[in-house]
Amino acid sequence: YTWSVFHDVEGLIDLFGSDQKFTIKMDSVFTLPSTIKPGTYGGVIHEMKEMELAGMGQYAHGNQPIQHMPYLYCYAGQPWKTQYWVRQIVERLYNSTEKGYPGDEDQGGMSSWYILSSLGIYAVCPGTDEYVIGSPLFKKATITMENGNKFVIEAPENSKENLYIQSATLNGRLLDKNYIHYDDIAEGGVLKFEMGSQPNKERCTSKYAAPFSLSKE
């Protein structure tokens, strides 16, 4: 539960000491061996086995409390790592076979993560109106609201290789933040991504671009 500070990621970063120390710790989650310690469970439960089979270090997507974690790079100046890991999870852990669902469906968390992340957005912090930017899976997707408004997400160059966001616009204006608001979707419009095969390490790396944290308010 180290990462479960949804309301104040900036405060969590401060406890680590710096953005760099925070992201190094995040990197380690994906690179440590996928070893299992049953602990008080007394045996290996399915979430542990699913983590081992996924082969993403200690990242256990089948256990919902960590599903927001790949998006936290957007708070620490490395959004391209969010883009990389979100696409890895979407493409490697979900598919249309009997093995294509990486865990159980607690309160709709597993499927809603996929739906939102495949669109290129995710609601990290409950109680805010922000959706953090990830990496869209599709070249074009349209969300039709109840009132008939349409929010279109476009990524014409998108492909398995072109998973990194080079630039983004919202209704024709440069999007220089790692998030959009619910009203942007509800009112309708166009979110357009320029995609590429290499990360743009200059885009949206400042604290200005980071999503909501209580420590920033």
Residue ranges and their predicted role:
Residues 1-152, 157, 183, 190:
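Active-site core of glycosidic bond-cleaving carbohydrate-active enzymes
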Residues 146, 170-173:
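Short strand-turn-strand beta-turns centered on an Asx-Gly dipeptide
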Residues 156, 173, 196:
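Surface loops and adjacent helix of pleckstrin homology
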Residues 161-167:
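Beta-strand-rich binding/interaction modules
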Residues 176-181:
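Short, solvent-exposed S/T- and G/P-enriched segments that are highly enriched in secreted/extracellular
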Residues 182-217:
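C-terminal beta-strand-rich structural cap/linker in extracellular carbohydrate-active enzymes
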